[in-house]
Amino acid sequence: MDADRGGGQETKVIYHIDDETTPYLVKIPIPSAQVTLRDFKLVLNKQNNNYKYFFKSMDADFGVVKEEIADDSTILPCFNGRVVSWLVSADGTNQSDNCSELPTSECELGMGLTNRKLQQQQQQHQQQQQQQQQQHQQQQQQQQQQVQPVQLAQQQQQQVLHHQKMMGNPLLQPPPLTYQSASVLSSDLDSTSLFGTESELTLDRDMTDYSSVQRLQVRKKPQRRKKRAPSMSRTSSYSSITDSTMSLNIITVSINMEAVNFLGISIVGQSNRGGDGGIYVGSIMKGGAVALDGRIEPGDMILQVNDVNFENMTNDEAVRVLREVVQKPGPIKLVVAKCWDPNPKGYFTIPRTEPVRPIDPGAWVAHTQALTSHDSIIADIAEPIKERLDQNNLEEIVKAMTKPDSGLEIRDRMWLKITIPNAFIGADAVNWVLENVEDVQDRREARRIVSAMLRSNYIKHTVNKLTFSEQCYYVVNEERNPNLLGRGHLHPHQLPHGHGGHALSHADTESITSDIGPLPNPPIYMPYSATYNPSHGYQPIQYGIAERHISSGSSSSDVLTSKDISASQSDITSVIHQANQLTIAAHGSNKSSGSSNRGGGGGGGGGGNNTNDQDVSVFNYVL
């Protein structure tokens, strides 16, 4: 809006009203330096308080601003020789009409009429609201006099629900249906409509006459709450996790040969007509570089040395590469696959006595209802008391332990291509004694009892070890337990050809010691991808396969588990300690020598049926 001095005595003022685009022009017969707000209002003839007056001015801190002036004696600011003004309605509504094309007097007259009409409409609207409220109250009073007390209570409840739905108050939400209140009669459903009476419907029609703002406030719908995702049920068991699904850990170990002048490991491997079975760490010597590092353990498979991969190499080639690397000065980098952990923790194991079966929800619910409705029958059917054995009677313990329904897993085991009939693992025997022998409180006491059984010659180790280990295979000694013959467990003819007892004889042990070095069982999961498919008995299981059946010239099938691997490794360790190891070391240039024995390493074969398939050659080198 511009104001220019006209002839030194007249001031032209251009102003805007609310949101109108066309400005208005007035002339004030006063110099611009003396014109006040009162003079401006007199010219406009707007002495009421319906407008606020803003003028363009210059502020020292903010620059050009719109300054509101309310004092009539204030001189209007002059900005760049001009006076700029805006008139804004005080009540927030646009009270200006299309009078921009009319003269000033007609525009002022039209605006005055508009204000009067608005006031009259507001008064009429207020009177209508009061009349409607009075009518509604009278109707409610008449209905309250006619209805019974019970119906009145239902009506009040319906009104509360109605207002709750209209206003969206979360505190007034009805209680959720539970299993006790889920049954609803049809008569109750008919009486729970949104409008229970015609008066409420009339009230809703009356509410449509309100202003748009009031209708928005009344009919505001409550916001829907986001449905919380149901928590995952803990009943989803870990049955999908089996021993064979746990992968091996592949690590890279850099060994510094400057501090120690020898590697300090013995490597073992085997070969047969189906191919080579890989290179494994047989034992670790104290004081060597590997022992000082501490990350490599007996039974680990060597996959790579100094960026040379053993995947497509034979055992002889891999040994040659290892010997060449050891003889060279400098650090050695070994990539090894860790041996199978015989004792995985927590929920990664499933007890063999707990089979995994699909769950039928309907049968489960029916079974639960039957249990809750027949408590007396359940009380009568009590589980028979389990007979506990005397810990001092070792013979009775062995007899009970070898029964078919004893719970101890006794079956054919595979070790070094030899089938050991009716063998069990030491850890399983300790668990069985802990559960079935009286006055055995802890695992240490159970282990002591099983060790006494071994010393008393009731059970035997596969290679005649006299110290008990939970990771070894054991068989029952029939010479000490003649009553067990004919029970369907132990028979001499089930042993490999040439053996007269269930444990290997001393001569057989010496033969194995001279021919077989420390050879751990191949891991369940091959740590590297290859097309290697050996034809001998224990083939590697690929990741994700739940079970593997093994056939090695024997009439029975076997399933390889982590405990079997641990037992085989423990038995092999016992042979390692009996083997002669040779360590030749030199500072900066390590010389390695070893012994290689070919043929006849199978210890007599497995049953004598597939003799050609049982030809195994093993080696043992010390680095």
Swiss-Prot record:
The keyword Nucleus applies. It comes from the Eukaryota. Residues 8-91 form the DIX domain. One of its GO terms (cellular component) is apical cortex. GO terms for biological process: axon extension; border follicle cell migration; canonical Wnt signaling pathway; cell migration; compound eye morphogenesis; compound eye photoreceptor cell differentiation; dorsal closure; epidermis morphogenesis. Keywords: Cytoplasm, Developmental protein, Membrane, Nucleus, Phosphoprotein, Segmentation polarity protein, Wnt signaling pathway. Residues 217-229 have a biased composition (Basic residues). Residues 404-478 form the DEP domain. It is found in: Cytoplasm; Nucleus; Membrane. Interacts with nkd. This interaction may require zinc. This is Segment polarity protein dishevelled. It comes from Drosophila melanogaster. The gene is dsh.
